[in-house]
């Protein structure tokens, strides 16, 4: 009898790490991969996020491990405190709530509330501008978005969402092309009043703007704004033919509606 107890205890000690690891695992779905901008890597069955800013990840392995990042996110929102960190990741909170996780109450975030109040979103419109020969980065046109406003009157009071490279503005055309093709620039999202965009593209550069309304549900619209807030604090490597304005907007829409898998259709290149 004592021998059987010894065997049982020995097996328990041997199996416990595996059991604990299995319990710690949380299934990573397409929604989480899209929310973290994770793409299949070139080295087998692994992932890497297109986001390069360290402040976007809670786990030290977060850029290359969506599972580790998911566990770190669950831990963050399951406990009290860390309000400042939580306020940077409202879309992740919404995602976890939708999956049924028991979480602590989301904190009051004044800057996030002001962001929503400034936008007063009522819809999202995809915009495409004509090519502009005086700017090498706009030779194929430019893709951006407009967050339509619920305010009465003109959409000039809406806000535009733009992804672009952060350049010094003083580079010559050759250096600009080399850096743009090889990832020499960082890129990021900016939100600005739509009348500024109209003034630049229509009035100054004399470019046409084509509009395509997106059929987002109210829940998807809210999630889009929340995720835009998240990635608005981040940067990515900018590549003219791959990680450009069109591609990053597709990744953002995939986060809202993962089943679209828009970015999957452009594994090699995406023309702006």
Predicted regions, residues:
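Bacterial N-terminal signal peptides
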Residues: 7-16
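Active-site-adjacent bridging/hinge elements
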Residues: 115-123, 136-138, 142, 215-228
């Amino acid at each position: 009898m004592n021998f059987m107890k010894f065997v049982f205890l020995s097996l328990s000690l041997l199996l416990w790490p595996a059991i604990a690891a299995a319990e710690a695992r949380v299934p990573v779905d397409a929604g989480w991969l899209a929310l973290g901008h994770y793409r299949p890597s070139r080295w087998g069955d692994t992932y890497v996020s297109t986001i390069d800013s360290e402040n976007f990840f809670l786990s030290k392995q977060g850029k290359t491990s969506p599972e580790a990042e998911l566990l770190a996110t669950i831990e963050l929102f399951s406990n009290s405190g860390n309000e400042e960190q939580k306020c940077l990741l409202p879309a992740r909170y919404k995602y976890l709530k939708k999956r049924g996780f028991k979480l602590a109450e989301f904190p009051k975030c004044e800057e996030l509330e002001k962001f929503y109040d400034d936008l007063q979103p009522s819809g999202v419109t995809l915009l495409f501008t004509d090519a502009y020969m005086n700017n090498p980065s706009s030779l194929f046109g430019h893709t951006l978005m407009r967050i339509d406003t619920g305010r009465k009157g003109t959409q000039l009071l809406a806000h535009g969402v733009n992804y672009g490279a952060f350049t010094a503005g003083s580079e010559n055309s050759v250096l600009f092309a080399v850096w743009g093709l090889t990832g020499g620039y960082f890129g990021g999202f900016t939100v600005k009043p739509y009348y500024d965009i109209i003034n630049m593209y229509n009035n100054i550069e004399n470019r046409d703007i084509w509009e395509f309304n997106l059929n987002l549900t109210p829940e998807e619209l809210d999630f889009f704004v929340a995720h835009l807030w998240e990635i608005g604090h981040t940067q990515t490597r900018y590549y003219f033919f791959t990680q450009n304005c069109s591609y990053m907007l597709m990744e953002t829409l995939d986060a809202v509606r993962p089943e679209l898998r828009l970015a999957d259709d452009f594994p090699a290149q995406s023309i702006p």
